[in-house]
Amino acid sequence: MSSPLTDRSARLQALQHALRERILILDGGMGTMIQSYKLEEADYRGERFADWPSDVKGNNDLLLLSRPDVIQAIEKAYLDAGADILETNTFNATQVSQADYGMQSLAYELNVEGARLARQVADAKTAETPDKPRFVAGVLGPTSRTCSISPDVNNPGYRNVTFDELVENYVEATRGLIEGGADLILIETIFDTLNAKAAIFAVQGVFEELGVELPIMISGTITDASGRTLSGQTTEAFWNSVRHARPISVGLNCALGAKELRPYIEELSTKADTHVSAHPNAGLPNAFGEYDESPAEMAVVVEEFAAAGFLNIVGGCCGTTPAHIEAIAKAVAKYPPRAIPEIPRACRLSGLEPFTIDRSSLFVNVGERTNITGSAKFARLIREENYAEALEVAQQQVEAGAQVIDINMDEGMLDSKAAMVTFLNLIASEPDISRVPIMIDSSKWEVIEAGLKCIQGKGIVNSISMKEGVEAFKHHARLCKRYGAAVVVMAFDEDGQADTQARKEEICKRSYDILVDEVGFPPEDIIFDANIFAIATGIEEHNNYAVDFINACAYIRDNLPYALSSGGVSNVSFSFRGNNPVREAIHSVFLYYAIRNGLTMGIVNAGQLEIYDEIPKALRDRVEDVVLNRTPEATEALLAIADDYKGGGAVKEAEDEEWRSYSVEKRLEHALVKGITTWIVEDTEECRQQCARPIEVIEGPLMSGMNVVGDLFGAGKMFLPQVVKSARVMKQAVAHLIPFIEAEKGDKPEAKGKILMATVKGDVHDIGKNIVGVVLGCNGYDVVDLGVMVPAEKILQTAIAEKCDIIGLSGLITPSLDEMVHVAKEMQRQNFQLPLMIGGATTSKAHTAVKIDPQYSNDAVVYVTDASRAVGVATSLLSKELKADYVARTRADYAVVRERTANRSARTERLSYEQAIANKPAFDWAGYQAPTPSFTGVRVLDEIDLAVLAEYIDWTPFFISWDLAGKYPRILTDEVVGEAATSLFNDAQAMLKKLIDEKLIKARAVFGFWPANQVEHDDLEVYGADGETLATLHHLRQQTIKPDGKPNLSLADFVAPKESGVRDYIGGFITTAGIGAEEVAKAYEAKGDDYNSIMVKALADRLAEACAEWLHERVRKEYWGYARDEHLDNEALIKEQYVGIRPAPGYPACPDHTEKGTLFELLDPQGLSGVSLTEHYAMFPAAAVSGWYFAHPQAQYFAVGKIDKDQVERYSQRKGQEASVSERWLAPNLGYDD
């Protein structure tokens, strides 16, 4: 007879085989079935607990001992229904949960019995059907307490359970489950990820102790419409936090029904490189807490999961029964299991939100001001235990651009461990801070470990090293791995810190090999700190410190696969402490070279970085001499001019307290929504004195504010930690009012219809949508505006919740077209019966007819050309008399468009890609003298004078944005629209003056020039100052057959080929006038003034484009200087009567939006422009323009047009990506269907 371990090993092999073959079935709700038995107190007690001093009814785990027959009968019923995996009835079998009944001493026994009983039932079923073995998952539930959330709203740093207590509980439970015969460990219903991390830590410890390793299943719980866990994490952030467990599956269960769970399971299925499970509830509970979704109804939804390829394991949770499981098993039986995707290696961190770093990422700013050793202010606040202001320091770092925050509490007179724990617990209740990953920084291991026990996300340990020997290094690394943290590894060994390049490389290589080969540490989670030491100290041996570090970064990048690099940047300038301008210049120059050589991240003051090209040349030259150790006299030369720059840094700390100027009612609402307690008592008192009775403060502004909080929470715009903060504010306000209270002992016309409007996911443009909304609102329609960047599931959920009559989608950038198709598909899948309106700059009748309309047949899909047509379309769609005829005509029209498009595509002949290359322009490069820019590198122009930019505005697009057709200035005297245009223009001038005079918005530009050459006909290599390749720009070539011998153009044609030997150049720019525009527009919206809100955004757009025009003129005449004698008025500029071009990625000459990412990497790796890119490469703020500069005298604007598959395949090869990825981004340009 084989041993139990051998039997378990055989079962696990069978499990792996089964997962490859089919979708496995998990059982259903145990609690649901127990309730069906209608057990009484006596059943729970049995003989053994007849005299137990407290009630035990409801302790379902106790039935393992008092009514095992019931538990096994339920388990057998699930196996008979088709379940492959039984969950043990041990959801609450931990001491902390059993303590509610005074039964904590039974925890171990309950887990043993739970696994033993399930094992018996599973083995009996396997004996009946040997070809289909059944498995037992030992359940570890979440417990009744949370490690990340305080149970006391007045004390956010308090916890009623610790990580260590949970580990102790889970260790005991895991031992019992293994002893009882479990095949797997299932950590489920995770609403607080820190609890789950404690469970993982415990389970892995037991495995190591017992010398056995079982597969781990992990299942989280998305609790509401926000798509987050109760403790605030998104689905991807949750996965990043637990993936170190290397689970056999990750999934979601409970809280939501299958329908509501779908978008989160879909996301998980694309992100997780392991099997995916789902065991949703039987719908959502009704008013009586019961579940109404029938087996057939639930199976229909779950079958969609399987058909879409989301599932490897599926079962049920609350409200599900054996009948549900049987229906689900039958529904998914015909579908193959989900194929596990290959996810690229990357350091995947998380706070409340995910954060991914890889070799292609822009430089990562790690905020340093929450480091006691780096900030005197922060140190003082911590010593004074002024944690409220200390949290503000952290928040300022995040708002200033820190993507990770470094927290260090090492100070001789401080209890560092206690301070670290307190501060991290408080951060957990501050979503604006805890959304980013945490770097726990300490030289004391006990402080690091205490910090790791406080963060639910995947953070970074700073640091471990071989300073105390290899064994201690490996011990700490193993623990970091078990806690699920990335690590900063110092270049430090038994002989001390590495100070030379050779020592840095030697220690980093040795550390890497030990971590990867001996510890099994993921290489992508290793971040080397090769030691940044102070330069310009006057000691000759220190002169090469910066060069050694920079070269070490390059070594790490080139020789240690997937590893990253970091450093404490302020160390390099320590010898100039007290002289902030010089220090900032040193930091900027140092980072400029270190980033180019592979530095991934740096601990910096996120709000205080000087711009490399903005450093005065005299200072920058001396600093570069010091940083790069170019001359022996570099230090003396820098010291000689250092005092000239002394007297304050480039960036000042400032607190934004603008909201304090609001009315007291608005201040109270703001405080409640933001969770600010600082002024709540004085504001409450001020409001009390304005009211007739103190109770009116509660019934009025306080309840109004809490209604806002409730609305935001219900809509998924706030989540639990924020609501807890709001409740704390409310309590303080009410507490102030109670003594005063005790001392005292129209009809609305019906809307024509409700229309939901949204700018789709990935797109931030909303001017057109807002105008349409205003027009519809003025015509009696109730408009529900979801804003920008709205995912499909939110659009559809809101349409149902708001009982909308029409859904309207808007988008400006080409990737939005795909997202609209996705929404249409989802509407069809979910059987919506609502009309769909499509609008936006990139949309068209042809795209709507060809791509969107065929995806949704339940109701009409209508392309709306402009705001003026929206009312007529809406009226037709909602009219009983007009709709049928209108929809029929629209569909017939679209059928014609589709046929015409198909015929045109079939008729159109194009050159092969090779033929198109052969027909490129023939320029005389041998005789070409490329103009040389006045500088190379990047410069920033901050707070550009808006009055100057106003002279460059092209007003014609402004009128078009308001749906007034005509060319400026003739439109002002147009017979039809002249009066309206003039009135609008006068209002625009008044608003423009206000924006300029009051400096309500700001304009900024980042631009640069680099040496460049054409390679492979259609690509451009961009070079650094030393000739190294900084980036490759990928362009496309026209393939349409040209008449009269005209060439097939590519933007690459306008730069000299590499083989010509000509040193040519390219430029790039980002301009924005949107800084502050969103806030100004929202202020008008808050007053109900949609007109001026839209006006502000429209003018910001025009100013951003004007800024691009103004800057291009300066480039031509000054910065590049190839047209110094140019004299063009604004009309000539608008007509593009200049030499050179400034094409924008995503537009006709370079239609691939992803190239914008390369432009931003070259121009703005530190985020100094104030403009960022969304996942679909839209710029935010929306009032922004970016593009390339070409100076060749024959450079011209053109459209690439339709291209064929041969070019797409070559383009994809050059970009190093799958052709399907290129096809998605180039969809409007594809001249083929498959």
Curated annotation (Swiss-Prot):
<dbReference type="GO" id="GO:0008270">
    <property type="term" value="F:zinc ion binding"/>
</dbReference>
<keyword id="KW-0846">Cobalamin</keyword>
<feature type="binding site" description="axial binding residue">
    <location>
        <position position="765"/>
    </location>
    <ligand>
        <name>methylcob(III)alamin</name>
    </ligand>
</feature>
<protein>
    <recommendedName>
        <fullName>Methionine synthase</fullName>
        <ecNumber>2.1.1.13</ecNumber>
    </recommendedName>
</protein>
<dbReference type="InterPro" id="IPR006158">
    <property type="entry name" value="Cobalamin-bd"/>
</dbReference>
<feature type="binding site">
    <location>
        <begin position="1197"/>
        <end position="1198"/>
    </location>
    <ligand>
        <name>S-adenosyl-L-methionine</name>
    </ligand>
</feature>
<keyword id="KW-0949">S-adenosyl-L-methionine</keyword>
<dbReference type="InterPro" id="IPR033706">
    <property type="entry name" value="Met_synthase_B12-bd"/>
</dbReference>
<comment type="similarity">
    <text>Belongs to the vitamin-B12 dependent methionine synthase family.</text>
</comment>
<feature type="binding site">
    <location>
        <position position="254"/>
    </location>
    <ligand>
        <name>Zn(2+)</name>
    </ligand>
</feature>
<keyword id="KW-0028">Amino-acid biosynthesis</keyword>
<dbReference type="Pfam" id="PF00809">
    <property type="entry name" value="Pterin_bind"/>
</dbReference>
<dbReference type="InterPro" id="IPR036594">
    <property type="entry name" value="Meth_synthase_dom"/>
</dbReference>
<keyword id="KW-0489">Methyltransferase</keyword>
<dbReference type="InterPro" id="IPR004223">
    <property type="entry name" value="VitB12-dep_Met_synth_activ_dom"/>
</dbReference>
<comment type="function">
    <text>Catalyzes the transfer of a methyl group from methyl-cobalamin to homocysteine, yielding enzyme-bound cob(I)alamin and methionine. Subsequently, remethylates the cofactor using methyltetrahydrofolate.</text>
</comment>
<dbReference type="GO" id="GO:0046653">
    <property type="term" value="P:tetrahydrofolate metabolic process"/>
</dbReference>
<dbReference type="GO" id="GO:0005829">
    <property type="term" value="C:cytosol"/>
</dbReference>
<dbReference type="Pfam" id="PF02310">
    <property type="entry name" value="B12-binding"/>
</dbReference>
<dbReference type="InterPro" id="IPR036724">
    <property type="entry name" value="Cobalamin-bd_sf"/>
</dbReference>
<dbReference type="InterPro" id="IPR037010">
    <property type="entry name" value="VitB12-dep_Met_synth_activ_sf"/>
</dbReference>
<dbReference type="InterPro" id="IPR003759">
    <property type="entry name" value="Cbl-bd_cap"/>
</dbReference>
<feature type="binding site">
    <location>
        <position position="814"/>
    </location>
    <ligand>
        <name>methylcob(III)alamin</name>
    </ligand>
</feature>
<keyword id="KW-0170">Cobalt</keyword>
<feature type="binding site">
    <location>
        <begin position="762"/>
        <end position="766"/>
    </location>
    <ligand>
        <name>methylcob(III)alamin</name>
    </ligand>
</feature>
<feature type="binding site">
    <location>
        <position position="317"/>
    </location>
    <ligand>
        <name>Zn(2+)</name>
    </ligand>
</feature>
<feature type="domain" description="Hcy-binding">
    <location>
        <begin position="12"/>
        <end position="332"/>
    </location>
</feature>
<feature type="binding site">
    <location>
        <position position="318"/>
    </location>
    <ligand>
        <name>Zn(2+)</name>
    </ligand>
</feature>
<keyword id="KW-0486">Methionine biosynthesis</keyword>
<feature type="binding site">
    <location>
        <position position="810"/>
    </location>
    <ligand>
        <name>methylcob(III)alamin</name>
    </ligand>
</feature>
<dbReference type="GO" id="GO:0032259">
    <property type="term" value="P:methylation"/>
</dbReference>
<dbReference type="Pfam" id="PF02574">
    <property type="entry name" value="S-methyl_trans"/>
</dbReference>
<keyword id="KW-0808">Transferase</keyword>
<feature type="domain" description="B12-binding">
    <location>
        <begin position="752"/>
        <end position="888"/>
    </location>
</feature>
<dbReference type="GO" id="GO:0031419">
    <property type="term" value="F:cobalamin binding"/>
</dbReference>
<dbReference type="Pfam" id="PF02965">
    <property type="entry name" value="Met_synt_B12"/>
</dbReference>
<feature type="domain" description="AdoMet activation">
    <location>
        <begin position="904"/>
        <end position="1234"/>
    </location>
</feature>
<comment type="pathway">
    <text>Amino-acid biosynthesis; L-methionine biosynthesis via de novo pathway; L-methionine from L-homocysteine (MetH route): step 1/1.</text>
</comment>
<feature type="binding site">
    <location>
        <position position="954"/>
    </location>
    <ligand>
        <name>S-adenosyl-L-methionine</name>
    </ligand>
</feature>
<feature type="domain" description="B12-binding N-terminal">
    <location>
        <begin position="655"/>
        <end position="749"/>
    </location>
</feature>
<dbReference type="InterPro" id="IPR050554">
    <property type="entry name" value="Met_Synthase/Corrinoid"/>
</dbReference>
<feature type="domain" description="Pterin-binding">
    <location>
        <begin position="363"/>
        <end position="624"/>
    </location>
</feature>
